[in-house]
A protein has these predicted regions:
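Short acidic-aromatic low-complexity motifs
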Residues: 2-28
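Short beta-strand edge/turn micro-motifs at domain boundaries
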Residues: 97-120
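Short, solvent-exposed coil/turn segments at beta-strand boundaries
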Residues: 28, 78-82, 104-112
């Protein structure tokens, strides 16, 4: 298992470990989606776990269509309390369908904020 919480979050997600992924978040952690009324939508607590479940189900649908979600290794910013992960959704031929970044804010080896930015 990786030594940083961001990598652990993605590793556990790839294993479909819902609770393990959820436990990467601080008790007061938030996940801000790229779409919604705020702009985006801020999720907390059980809402984060529910979204992880939905994301795993979506991953199965994406793979059934011959597409793949690709997540790059996290890049930590100079203060070490923030990290950026580039990601893309690719068609079977490798064409990028969507791309974006997740901006993480960290505290005490937990995710405090996961803020998603997406280009479609």
């Amino acid at each position: 298992m990786s030594d940083n919480v961001v990598s652990r979050f993605f590793e556990l997600g790839a294993k479909e470990d819902i609770d393990g992924s959820w436990e990467c978040f601080a008790e007061d952690g938030v996940w801000i989606t790229s779409d919604g009324p705020e702009p985006g939508k801020t999720l907390r607590g059980q809402e984060i776990r529910d979204l992880i479940v939905q994301m795993n189900e979506l991953e199965h649908q994406i793979r059934a269509q011959g597409m793949e979600g690709v997540f790059e290794k996290p890049v930590f910013l100079s203060n070490g309390n923030q990290a950026v992960v580039e990601w893309s959704l690719r068609a079977a031929d490798g064409t990028i369908v969507q791309r974006g970044i997740d901006l993480f804010t960290l505290r005490d080896d937990k995710i405090v904020v996961k803020d998603v930015f997406r280009k479609a």
